[in-house]
Every structure is written in structure tokens, then in C-alpha cells.
Amino acid sequence: MLNNLLKKVFGSRNDRLIKQYSQNVTAINALEAKIGALSDAELRGKTEEFRQRIGEGADLDMLLPEAFAVVREAGKRVLGMRHFDVQLIGGMVLHDGKIAEMRTGEGKTLMATLPAYLNALAGKGVHLVTVNDYLAKRDAEWMGRIYRFLGISVGVILSQMDHGDKQAAYAADITYGTNNEYGFDYLRDNMVTHPLERVQRVLNFAIVDEVDSILIDEARTPLIISGQAEGNTDVYVRMNALIPKLVRQENEDSPGDFSVDEKAQQVLLSEAGFEHAEKLLVQSGLLPSGTSLYDPANINLVHHLYAGLRAHALFHRDQHYVIQNGEVVIVDEFTGRLMAGRRWSEGLHQAVEAKEGVTIQKENQTLASITFQNYFRMYEKLAGMTGTADTEAYEFQQIYGLETVIIPTHRPMIRVDRMDQVFRTMDEKYQAIIADIKDCQERGQPVLVGTTSIENNELLSSLLTREKLPHQVLNAKQHAREAEIVAQAGRPKMITIATNMAGRGTDIVLGGNPEPEFERIRSDESLSESEKTERIAELQQQWQTLHDEVLEKGGLHIIGTERHESRRVDNQLRGRSGRQGDPGSSRFYLSLEDALLRIFASDRVASIMQRLNMPQGEAIEHPWVTRAIENAQRKVEARNFDIRKQLLEYDDVANDQRKVIYQQRNELLESEDITETTTAMRADMLRNLIALHVPPQSVEEEWDISGLEKALAAEYHLTLPLREWLEKEPDLHEDSLHQRIIEAANALYSGKVEQVGAPIMHQYERAVMLQSLDMHWREHLASLDHLRQGIHLRGYAQKNPKQEYKREAFELFTSMLEEIKAEVSKTLMAVQIRSEQQVEAVAETHHAPVNVQYHHAAFEEALGEEKSPESIGEDIEGREHPQKHQPFVRQGEKIGRNDPCPCGSGKKYKQCHGKLN
């Protein structure tokens, strides 16, 4: 009550921000005539002038009004597009590192040119992040005309791009690319064996398009680079044959072997199911007779059993995946697109392959991973834009520290959003949808029907075909024609069925989009300029007639066939209609058999329908029902937020360790000579070995001198007469013995260095160190995965799983560093180098792996659960040696030796993980 009163008096926080930005808009508009009077050369010269002013100490905020006015004028001259006042406000919101919520069709792509140009002037690079390669390429070419006109270089990074081209793209002032490619390039840069192989610069400023999709939906799925692990695929085939013999329980108390929790997306074996599974495994020869499924030696069988159960009970063909060219291809849950080459982790993909009877490929081992949450938080400044962010504003603020600002529309929004209609059954719902589509088609109104899966998409298509209604289908299988289908979805009588969010980023123009046809005429060399102009004018007139016809019929009508878990995704579907003040309408059709209602709201809605005594085939349309559905969606949104927050809390532990490893790795690559580091490591390891045989503060009678002599000879190739030293020098005590052994080891190593020369030895030291660091880091990632999957069980022992995870992860990390030191020290002491070729051979074996895959692992896998996993895979192309030197720039702040160690131990960095340096 008090909040509402204060808002009325002072306005909301959003209103106050818009008011502040509007003052700057007035200043920009005042410069329009002056900037407009400049010649093209003078306008281009403004870029150099701004750069000089920055060099002299000017702040970007001081340049903002004039820089925005320059970009606006360039847009008018190059593209014939003038930035509206609301786009100027949006540009300022992005420049301030906030999220701009802007309705579909209001010109987000053009708006981004303002902050991108301003921030590119500083010379540190600006990254524009899109959801797919098509949009990255389109926007780089389209908006790149403005940047290039103003003397700003533009690059685009694509998934199959040559290494040298990618370096050049990152070196440009402004770079366009996908979220996946930026993340994978960061991981690849931290797997290189030479500083010149890196592609990225400092992570300065990122503008994320469709920020809700990338930072919320895809935040649940870590980016993973993996390589094939050794293993026999036969076990998947044999396990798959057993799964159909296990019986699914109808409910918790009914007989059966396993239950399926759709809400948590888990499969659980009952006690009877556990015994039945053991018998079947013994009969098949997978489980040795007389042993238990949960014996340590059989733990892998449990992994395979649950993977098989999930593959059969939770993952369905044409919904979660399709079969294409004899391979299981994942369908992206959020966009409906095919994710060619992506693979689910933890054996799930192999289990699905076994279920479908296609060739089973080997499991993967994680080489490097990061979540989008941790990747994008590394940018010095982060901003985003979308048509639907307000429902997730709290999460953006909590996780990323990003404020959401709702930008006013250029023209009032007049779309009519009708109330949901709820039916008892799917059949009744689809009959009502067909009737609505028929009505629109008869009136000449275009319709866009949104479905949640390929299965529903194709079901509706078959129903329309039966009714002899011509239509176009857009799902993952028609991915190549996506932009073309979406562009023409606004033509009169056009019926388009699309999976949710497919085609996002391409506007649906009422009357159809004439631009592709215009482009074809412009590029036709057989036509004269006058013929081109005449044909374009003729087409423009035809389009205007169609456009006016659609406006008269009520604009684009949106039909939702099911509510999504997130209100935001429903709003995105609705947002395809009513762009830039156009008319439009929308309605969702639901049934009690829909997944969301069945799992979260069926009892409440069913009881409402019974109270209202609804007859068969009759729809319910009531605020109570709408409220019940919204409450169900809020429940799911809150649950998903908790999962993402939990994932981040766990991943932060790995992220702190990743920062330490990557910083040390980068320092290794940059160092010409790491002798000081290897000498300190060797001394450390020798002290540990000596302490095992000569305990600290012990008397000489407790010393195991012969054991120490053997250990030094076996592990460090040091043959020392320790007993003779002690007999000849009675004053030789524990500390001086330590010192004598370390000096002897250093002398032996110095002899090796003199033998081959310091430069060759330094090169070898670095190669060995990198090899050991990378190998142990990969093994450590696997250990963290295993730890995380079982950590929730600590709750039964009244322990906090998160605290236990932090503690054990720290112990694993410390143990890994000790193993690296020991391995490097022993290798360097044992090696006999005779030529530079031997060193090069060692370095050659440690080149970046070539047969790797890039994928998203399911976010619940990271927490010991699984849901809607996605993965991406492409072979790394042969890396060419870069033509241009790329200076190393540290990612994030350097950790000082006396700073607290980022691993969370509470010790100083130099006394903890800084010891490796």
C-alpha cells in the first residue's frame, strides 16, 4: 500500500531512470542539425577526434551525446534508418551496463550500434553476443556498414572459422559472435601450448542480444570441451536389452520396479526393482554372481542402469531428439533447433543410441568447462537486451548484478491478448485450435501457431493437412529455411506452425518481407538501373496492398498450443505480434493433459471445472484458472531459479580453482625461464620425501637412512652416500642434511642443463610443466564431477552438502597441486636430453587435442540430476600458426602474493596455491 503511494508520488525506479536518460536525449537531438551539416569525410573524422580526446583523458560519458548523434547521422546516410528517441534511451541503458527490455520490432539491433561505437572508441574491443551464427553474420554485415563508414573495424566469429581469421575478428574494434563460440574460444585459449595461438583479447564489454535466453535459459547448461575416453560400448547394448523387462510404477504405492518423477526429471528404482535388476544383470553376465550392484567394483553398472532408465522413460524421439543419418541429434529445448554434433554427457547419449538401435559412440572425458554465468561475469562491463526480461529482473540483479530497465515503445502497443481457454482433453483442445485457424484463414488473417515440441508441431501439421488447410512448418528439421519461413509468416491467409522461439531474431513483417526480393533485383546484372528502380517500386506497391489488407484483418494472430514452464517464453511468443504499433491478437489453448497442468496445477484446475459443471467439449475461460496457471508457472520459475543459483554456488568453487590454474598456465606460457619455479618445487618435494624417512624433531635412532637412500635413487635418480656422510660428520643434523641433499639435487640438474644448453632445457621444462598441469586438471575436473554427483547424500548425515563440497574440493585441489609438483620434479630429474629434436617431440605430443567435442552438459547432471540436456560438437580444425602476434592480456585482476587465496582456504596466496609459482 505504502509502496504504491510512493510510486504515485515519486514514480517508479524505472520512470525516474527514463526521465534522467531523456535529458541526454534532448542534448543529442540538439546536435542533430549540426552533425547533419558535416560532409561524409568530416563525419568519419569524428572517430579520430573522439579517440584523441579519450587519449587526453576524456571520459566516455562526456563523449556520449556527440558520439550518439554521429552514429544516428551515419545510420541515416548508410542504411536510411534514423535512431528513434527510445532507441537512444536504450543505447544509454546498455552503455551503463544494464539490461534494456524493448518490445519485439522496436529495433534492438540498430539500438546496439550506439553503445558499441562509443565503447569501441576506447580500443579495448566490444563483443556483441547473439544466439546463432546466422544472426551474428547478418548483424555484422548489416550494422557493420555504419561502423565501417565511421572508420571502426568489424569482425564476426563463426563456429567453423579458420584460426587466423578468428584472431583477426577478435582484434577488430567490434566483434559479433555466438555465446557458445565466445565461451569455447575462452576455454580453447586456456588449452593452447603457445601464447601466439590465443585468439581472445581482454574481456572488456559485452552486449548480449536475447539476454534472457543466454544468461537464464542456457545458464543451466555448462559449456564443456571433451575428448573420447576409453571404454567398451557393448555394455550399453546389453543394458538396453534389460530395461524393457523392468516395470514402471503407476504411482508411489503401486507394484513395479521403478518410478518416474517428471517434476524433478528423475528415475528411481524401488527396493523390489533393485533386486529384480540385480537378478537380470547376473543372468546377462554383466554382474558377477554373489556380488551386489552397489559394490565399489560394480558402481559403473549403476551408472549404466540409470542412464538406460532415463533414456527410456524421460527422453522421447521427436521431442528431445531426432534420428538423422543414423545418429541421435539433440533438439534444443528452448529454440526447437537441431543441435548437430552435440552430445549428452554421463553415458545418456550412448543409452539413447542403444535404445534407437543406431551406432553407439564412446563416452567423453571433460577437458575444460565453464558456465555462461561465470564466463560473462568476467567481462569488465556487461549489458543485455531482450523483449522479455522483466519477469526475470530479480535473477539478473542477484546473479549478474544487472538492473533491468523497461524502454517505452516508439508507438503504443495495441495487440489484444485474450484469456486462456482450458479444455479437459488434448483432442478437445486441438479441435478448438483448428476451428480458430479456419476462422482466421477465411477472414484472410495470418496465423502463427507456437508448439512446445517437434512432436506436437508435426501432429498439428497432420491435422491441418487432413482439413486441407495449406500451411508452412518451422521446426528443427526445417532449420535451413528458418529465416525465409519467418519472414513470410505475415502474408494474408498464411498459416505458420513453429516450435517455441524458433526464428527468434527475424521480424514477422505484416504483408510479408519484400527485402529478399528487393535484394535479388539489385544483384541482377542483366537489369539496368532504371529497370531495377521500376521493379522495386512495383513490388513495393504490391507489398503495401498486402500490408494494408493484413492490418484491416487485425494483424498477426498468435495461437499458443501449450503454456511453457516460463511466463517469459509465453510472452516471447505473444511478442511476435503487435510490432511497432501494428494490430494483433493472441490466445493460448490448454488442456488438463498438458505437461505443465498435469504436473503442477491439474488438481486445482480440475476442481474448478467440476465446480463450474463444465460439459464435454466446453472450454473454461475464467480469471481463477488463469491465476492457477500463473501460480504453477511461478512455482516452476522459482524452482528453476533455485537450481541455477545452486549450480552457480557449486560452480563458483570450481571457478576459483579454474582461475588459479589458468593464471598459472598463462604465466608459464609467457615465461622464458621457469628454472626458479622448478627449483622451488624440487626442494619442496625433496623436503616431503626426507620428512617421511627423517621425521622432524626426531632423534637419529629414528631415522631410516637406507630407506631414504633407496627412495632418492628410485624417484630422483640421486645416488648419495647418506650413511657415510653421517658417520664422517657427527655434527650433521636434520636441517643441514636437508640442505646437503637439495644442493646435490641442484648440482645434478645443473649438469643436465650444461650438457644441452639452458634454452633447450627451459623449453623442455615448460613443455613438461604444461603437460602435467593439463593432464592433472582434466583428472581433477572428473573428480569434481563425481564429488558433486554424490554430495547431496551428506545431508542425511546432518552435514551441509555445499560446505562439504567446498572442503573436499579444496582437499582435491591441494592434492592435485602436490601431484603436479612431484611428477614434474621426478620427470626433470630422470630425463636425459641429447638434442633439441627430443624437446620438440615432447612439445609436439602436447598440442591441443584434435578429436574433441564441444557441448552443453545438462545442468542437473552437474548436481547429480538430469533434465533437458544439450550438447554441441564440432571437430577442431587444424590450427594454423597465427600471422599476427596477439599480446597476452590477463583475464581479471592479478592475484597478489599477499592477497587471500581465491580457493577459500583463508591462507595467503603465496602460502597456499601460489606455492606452485
From Swiss-Prot:
Q: How is the cofactor bound?
A: May bind 1 zinc ion per subunit.
Superkingdom classification of source? Bacteria
Q: Which InterPro entries match?
A: Helicase_ATP-bd (IPR014001), Helicase_C-like (IPR001650), P-loop_NTPase (IPR027417), SEC_C_motif (IPR004027), SecA (IPR000185), SecA_CS (IPR020937), SecA_DEAD (IPR011115), SecA_motor_DEAD (IPR014018)
EC code: 7.4.2.8
A GO molecular function assigned to this protein is: ATP binding
Sequence intervals crossing the membrane? none
GO CC, alphabetical: cell envelope Sec protein transport complex; cytosol; plasma membrane
Names of required cofactors: Zn(2+)
The subcellular localization recorded is: Cell inner membrane; Cytoplasm
The reaction(s) catalysed by this protein are: ATP + H2O + cellular proteinSide 1 = ADP + phosphate + cellular proteinSide 2
Q: Which residues bind Zn(2+)?
A: C901, C903, C912, H913
GO biological process: one example: protein targeting
Biased composition range(s): Basic residues: 907-917
Functional description taken from the UniProt entry: Part of the Sec protein translocase complex. Interacts with the SecYEG preprotein conducting channel. Has a central role in coupling the hydrolysis of ATP to the transfer of proteins into and across the cell membrane, serving both as a receptor for the preprotein-SecB complex and as an ATP-driven molecular motor driving the stepwise translocation of polypeptide chains across the membrane.
Q: What does the subunit comment say?
A: Monomer and homodimer. Part of the essential Sec protein translocation apparatus which comprises SecA, SecYEG and auxiliary proteins SecDF-YajC and YidC.
Family per UniProt? Belongs to the SecA family.
What protein name does the entry list?
Protein translocase subunit SecA 1
Source organism per UniProt: Nitrosospira multiformis (strain ATCC 25196 / NCIMB 11849 / C 71)
Gene name as annotated: secA1
